[in-house]
C-alpha cells in the first residue's frame, strides 16, 4: 500500500509561524521530483514543537495541496495514546491516505504497552496505520516480535524501521510476510534494506534530491543493481551530512540553500554550524543541486 519513495517533509517557518507559502512550494517541488508520497508532521517536520492546531493545519494543507496526485501519510504519533488517536482521526477526516505513528517517546512503554497503544489507535480509525521505530529518538525499541504481533491487526499495514538494522528487517519480513510492508527510515541503508524485503523509504534526503532517490528505486526495480549501487554511492556523502547534526537541522539548511524556505527552526533546535553548512553546500554542488 505504501511502497516507493516518500518524503519526510520539513515544516517551513517564517517569523516563528508556519510558512504556508513555502509549504506549497515544497509540495510542488516534491511532486515534480517524482516521489510517491509525502509525510507531513513527522520527526523531520518538527512535530514535537508544533502546536496541536498547527499540526492539524499542516496535515490539512498538505492534503489540499496534493489533490490526490501522490499519497499523504500523515504523522500522527504522540507519547499520549489519546492525543495520537485524536490526530489520527483528524487525518482521516481531512482525507489523508494513512497515518504514521512513532513509538511513544520519553515514557518508555513496555512491549505490551506498545501493542496496546497501537491497537487502540488502529481500532479508532479506518486509515491504514504505519508503525515507526526509531529508538535513537524515543528511548524505546519496538522488537521484531512486537511488530509481527501488530501485523495481525487488520489496518496496521507497514512499519518505518529506522534503525538501519538488516537483521531486524529480515526477522520482521520472515515473521509477518506480506501483511507488513517494510519501509526504510534510514537513507544511508535504503539500498541494502531493499535487498532484505524492503519496499520503500521515508526519506529525509528527498527534501533536497527527490529525483536521485527515485532513480535509485527505479533502477533497483528494473533489475539494474549495479546502476542502483552507483546512485547509492553518489548519495552517501549527503546522506551522512544530513545527520551530522540533529535532523532536521541540516536538511533545513539545505532547503534554504535551494531557496525553498527560510533556515528557521523552532527552539531547542538551532541552525547548522557554518562549518557544516559549507560541507553540505559542497556536497550539494557535487550532486548538481547547486551551482558553485
Curated annotation (Swiss-Prot):
Active site: 132 (proton donor/acceptor), 160 (schiff-base intermediate with substrate)
Catalytic activity: L-aspartate 4-semialdehyde + pyruvate = (2S,4S)-4-hydroxy-2,3,4,5-tetrahydrodipicolinate + H2O + H(+)
One MF annotation (Gene Ontology) recorded for this entry: 4-hydroxy-tetrahydrodipicolinate synthase activity
EC class (word): lyase
Protein name: 4-hydroxy-tetrahydrodipicolinate synthase
Homology family: Belongs to the DapA family.
Subunit annotation: Homotetramer; dimer of dimers.
Domain of life according to the entry: Bacteria
Record bears the keyword DNA-binding: no
Coiled-coil spans in chain: none
PROSITE patterns associated with the record: DHDPS_1, DHDPS_2
Pfam families according to UniProt: DHDPS
